[in-house]
Amino acid sequence: MSKKPVRVAVTGAAGQIGYALLFRIASGEMLGKDQPVILQLLEIPDEKAQNALKGVIMELEDCAFPLLAGIEAHSDPLQAFKDTDYALLVGARPRGPGMERADLLAANAQIFTAQGKALNAVASRNVKVLVVGNPANTNAYIAMKSAPDLPAKNFTAMLRLDHNRAASQLAAKAGFKVGDIRKLTVWGNHSPTMYADYRFATVNGESVKAKINDQAWNKDVFLPTVGKRGAAIIAARGLSSAASAANAAIDHMRDWALGSGGEWVTMGVPSNGEYGIPAGIVFGFPVTTENGEYKIVEGLEIDAFSQECIDKTLAELQGEQDGVKHLL
């Protein structure tokens, strides 16, 4: 028996990440090859953006995806989020020339307050929300705080790109197959302060840390390379990472919806006080996922260097959160 279509809302749908994302969702890569989807696409109410969205929709139609049960174009979040089961909040205000971080936070607070309120009003009560638009953790926090009738746990931020970047760097360093790496995680904020932690990671049952055994490389090469990878891509390409970000969003949502099969993945989720992170802060943690729910991996030892890294990324997140509290 064929499954009932689910509704997937994507904001910033005509942007670079949206363009790299939508065709993969429509082909079944995110929710499974047996799950029909209705795409509910949101763009700003600007003629150029809406025309670009029309062009993307024409291309989606021309792919004749068997799983694509419908496509809608919207400029109002109250329509785009109606009854949605999954919401990927990709659209955000990028930092412009001469723009202070406080201005960026304020501009995004406006966007994500409105979207949080719209989700609260019209989305499915079980909606799974992934914030991709930066600053992702704080934007997820804003949306969550603006949707008091939805469970806080339904709001997540994307740290999977950092996780995937870390896995790739480890594989290159030690000659592993990237798909064989297990129990890797990224703590904290999706920013250069994130802490990619391979102390527990294994490849075919063997310790990655023991194989690499180089704390200087970890501190001086690995962490800065992963943390500043986005900036390196902008410098090389002249544009921000879009395809890799879309890929990470697919990974995040697929694992959340379909389960991670017992494997650790990284998600930015609201803390309940785990590892001393104050409750309510949206923080990158190691999680496992099953039956549409995620569970933070608890009981991991945090050594002095790791604690220092976690404290640093937490302080940055608390600073961002304090910077938007008056706007909520």
From Swiss-Prot:
Locate the active site: H190
Task: Give the residues the record marks as binding substrate.
Answer: R95, R101, N134, R165
Which Enzyme Commission number(s) are on file for it? 1.1.1.37
Q: Which residues bind NAD(+)?
A: G12, A13, A14, G15, Q16, I17, G18, N108, Q115, V132, G133, N134
Q: Which UniProt keywords apply?
A: NAD, Oxidoreductase, Tricarboxylic acid cycle
Catalytic activities:
(S)-malate + NAD(+) = oxaloacetate + NADH + H(+)
Instruction: Tell me the InterPro entries matching this sequence.
Output: L-lactate/malate_DH, Lactate/malate_DH_C, Lactate/malate_DH_N, Lactate_DH/Glyco_Ohase_4_C, Malate_DH_type2, NAD(P)-bd_dom_sf
Q: Name one GO biological process term.
A: tricarboxylic acid cycle
Keyword Oxidoreductase in annotation: yes
Q: Name one molecular function that GO assigns to this entry.
A: L-malate dehydrogenase (NAD+) activity
Pfam families tied to this protein = Ldh_1_C (PF02866), Ldh_1_N (PF00056)
Disulfide bond positions:
none
Which family does the entry's similarity section mention? Answer: Belongs to the LDH/MDH superfamily. MDH type 2 family.
Summarizing the function annotation, the protein's role is:
Catalyzes the reversible oxidation of malate to oxaloacetate.
Q: What is this protein called?
A: Malate dehydrogenase
- Taxonomic source organism: Delftia acidovorans (strain DSM 14801 / SPH-1)
Gene that produces this protein: mdh
